[in-house]
Design a protein with these regions (language model features):
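A short, conserved, highly charged catalytic patch centered on acidic carboxylates
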Residues: 2-3, 7, 11, 15-138
Length: 138
């Protein structure tokens, strides 16, 4: 019998995500070269904006857990704006439902994509960002 579970209650931490899907973090630059090669250099103002986003997040996170809306205001929206993903030719949609069928577990994980930006083959998405543990900008 297939069990249907909410993603936000089933995957509750990065450790849980790694264990559940057998994921291994890597800092190897060759892991996804299509995302790291031939990138333009960040300008001084872009670096300053990223530093400001990180510092705001860290200052607020120091006081405890942050709600999804707070994370969206402090981190997600400023990053999407800085990347130009609110402008032409991109389109933003929110809250489409997603289901992940895990055959080896006879399980369906169901949730919502918090933010989805689409432009042809480029998709930028934020999935179930309810409990953020860390934040990193490279």
């Amino acid at each position: 019998m297939v069990l249907t579970k909410p993603i936000s209650k089933t995957i509750t931490s990065l450790l849980n995500l790694r264990e559940r899907f057998n994921l291994t973090p890597t800092s190897n630059d060759q892991f996804s070269p299509e995302f790291t090669q031939d990138l333009p250099e960040l300008t001084d103002s872009e670096i300053a904006a990223l530093d400001q986003i990180r510092n705001r997040f860290l200052r607020h996170r120091e006081r405890g857990s942050l709600a999804e809306g707070t994370i969206n205001h402090l981190v997600i929206s400023p990053l999407l704006a800085l990347a130009g993903l609110y402008d032409e030719p991109f389109f933003v949609t929110t809250e489409p439902e997603v289901e992940l069928f895990l055959e080896d577990r006879d399980e369906i994980l169901r949730g919502r994509i918090d933010t989805l930006i689409i432009q042809q083959q480029l998709w930028v998405l934020v999935v179930e960002s309810k409990s953020t543990i860390a934040f990193s900008v490279a």
